[in-house]
């Protein structure tokens, strides 16, 4: 992928916890993170040359400040705007709403897993979602169901999730 992808901490930590951090390298090539995210992911995510820290050169956008997000989400949103990132990788609902208001393209953890299946990088989404949930990653059951339906790994009446 050639466009710059700015990442928040939560999805990076989630992929590390399920042993799939390298999948992000495969999918994106390089991820850009602001300093607050770099601090949040250590020591959970070991430093990697394809996770590049980039400092903000402008103040955090007022719309972002008003959203009362965490430092990582705030800096990731502002950096994505500042450098005109092609994609923002973030899971938190409030941050995704602000991103939409700012005109940013967004993907979350489940979206990356679906894309990885579509492109043949993983065979199934369900085992990785199950492991995310075992590791304490919270996602609305409705979103899990939607993702598994999109991955053709669950029928509309399957209630395992």
Located regions from the model:
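Hydrophobic alpha-helical interaction segments
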Residues: 110-154
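Active-site-proximal, substrate-binding regions of enzyme catalytic domains
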Residues: 2-87, 93-96, 100-105, 127, ...
